[in-house]
Amino acid sequence: CVVPCSFSKNEIDESINNNNIEYLPAASEAIACSIAAGLKMSGKKPIVIIQSSGLSNMVSCITSLLKPYGVTFPILVSWRTYSEGDSEIQHKHLSKELPNLISSLGYQKEILDSSDLINSINQINSCNEKYKICIIEKNTFDKVELYNDRIKKTNSKISRVRYLSSLNDLYKNKDILFIGTTGHTSREMFKFMPNTNNFYMAGNMGGALSIGFGAAKSGRNVIVCGGDAEFVMHMGGLTTVGRDADEINLTYILFDNGQNKSTGGQDTYQDHLNYIGIAENAGFQVFRKPIDSI
């Protein structure tokens, strides 16, 4: 049960390649945790892989599901680092405080052995019967390439960079607040939208739309640039915003590339979703067809 991270790319890609493993991508860490709990209580052997910044999304599941019901399974958490001046500011706090957060949940913690495969397997297996989290440091695993038939084939008719550049030209120096979701979208906005008023949401995945809603409720004209994986992480925000959609000036642009691009390009497995229908049912006025030209 996985929410991708670039530090965990190699073990995630190996689980996708391996036919003996069922790879279950989850919309959020809380969902991954709940799925794993259901699997464990049904006699299966789940493993959860997440990144450190997502552990907080699991806290309620840990304290109100796993601990009171005595459910244990391996949880692998990649330890994202931070150095002063890095753009990934969302990792600053837990780059130091991750061990303390784990301890506060009543879990043991252990850094996964990167030099001894057998020992690392034993470390993971020990989590099956105790409250214990294994921490994955950067470059713990050897490089793994996804098999060609496991790589998401994209069919984008227009590049996000080109679209963002056009937004910059259209809204140059206008009183409109742009909010970019975490990952490549915000990075590309920083580079290709220099003349607009932008807020770059480096972390807090799934929260860009809700931030935009708060700004729009205060009277601002807001355009949110979101992504397909971000769309589902906290989809309740969509229904909350949709309730007041007719009373605010907010536009939500969803870039659907079918991938978690910034964490290694893993498939989001969301081809079954009708984003337009979901947004419309939540209360949004929508374009009936995806935008494929400028």
Label for each model-derived stretch:
Residues 136, 225-229, 255:
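Active-site flanking residues adjacent to catalytic metal/cofactor-binding acidic residues
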Residues 1-213, 217-220, 269, 273-284, ...:
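Thiamine diphosphate
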Residues 84-86, 258-265:
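Long, charge-dense
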Residues 145, 236-238, 264:
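Short, function-defining helix-loop hinge/capping sites that tune catalysis or transport
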Residues 47-53, 220-241:
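DG-centered beta-turn motif at the end of beta-strands
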Residues 44, 63, 73, 233-256:
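A short alpha/beta connector and helix-capping loop motif
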